[in-house]
Amino acid sequence: MDADGASATDVAATLAWATSLVPPRSLGATWELLASVAAREVAVARMLEPHLDALSILAEATREGIDVDLEPGGSWGVFAAEGSGMRLEARHHDGVWTLHGSKPWCSLAADLDRALVTAWVDDERRQLFALDLRDPAVRVRTGPWHARGLERVVSAPIDVDGAVAVPVGEPGWYLRRPGFAHGGVGVAACWWGGALPLRDALREAAASDRADQLSRVHLARADTALWVARTVLRETAAVFGAGGSASEGLRATRARTVVAEAVETTLAEAAHALGPLPLVADEAHARRVADLQIYLRQHHGERDAARIGGDIATGAGTW
């Protein structure tokens, strides 16, 4: 992989690099790519992941025989979040779909060409649409965005006033498809890769002449957690790549939880072992920590744990 043209401080160059990539042919290869990019620069992986996810969704639709009337060129995002006080609706008239309303958490909307967006088609159902973000009927807000991590990956609302959109699948297809679970673990692969340089810093500290037993304890805790997470990611990729299982959603949530906890462990061990110096004197280290802390908030923490427990309690999730 040659990511020399990609930079966390140059969004346009990063997106141009992302669009030049040929998407990996397997799920495992995709996650490996994302992890390797995140190990180099977390923010670049954060920009690449939704683009690859969008291309994967469009490819999945094609495999299922869904007719999507568009060419998948340019840079893509995936906007599926919901927020209090905001609602994006889709209306159908004379064979044309248009979108109306607001959508929160639209990462890089000002920089991307297009996005796959979920919108409400009635009071209970959402449907996926392809939206041209350069359409004059789309207004991209610049904030609020005061993040210290992922500073350039602005995730603000968009307002849409009648922009024409292309449907991708029927209502509910986006959430029902097997690839929905796959995409969630792709984000976790970014988290995992982003934490590897912190493990390297801990190893360097533990190998120094001034190291004591506590330095080795901090390293061991981070190393063990990341090793377990890698094992889980590999097994999950193998299961999904072989055709999945009857509980792909549960398996994906388990994997994301294991990885998120491993990365949080690594962040904590690095903070305790290395102290404040790299956070104030090492720009790359400080940026990586800040980026990971923001990125990890895509994990739903205790809510995901409650979902896992609920599924298991009702008889799902056999090993």
What is the predicted role of each segment?
Residues G193, A220-W227, T253, T257-E264, ...:
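Generic structural signal for well-ordered, non-transmembrane alpha-helical segments
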Residues D2-A6, V228-E261, A268-D282:
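C-terminal helix-coil-helix/basic helical segment that borders enzyme active sites and/or dimer interfaces
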Residues L277-W319:
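Glycine-rich phosphate/cofactor-binding loops in nucleotide/flavin-utilizing enzymes
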Residues W145-W227:
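Glycine-rich beta->alpha junctions and the first turn(s) of the following alpha-helix
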Residues D2-D111, A313:
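Glycine-rich flavin
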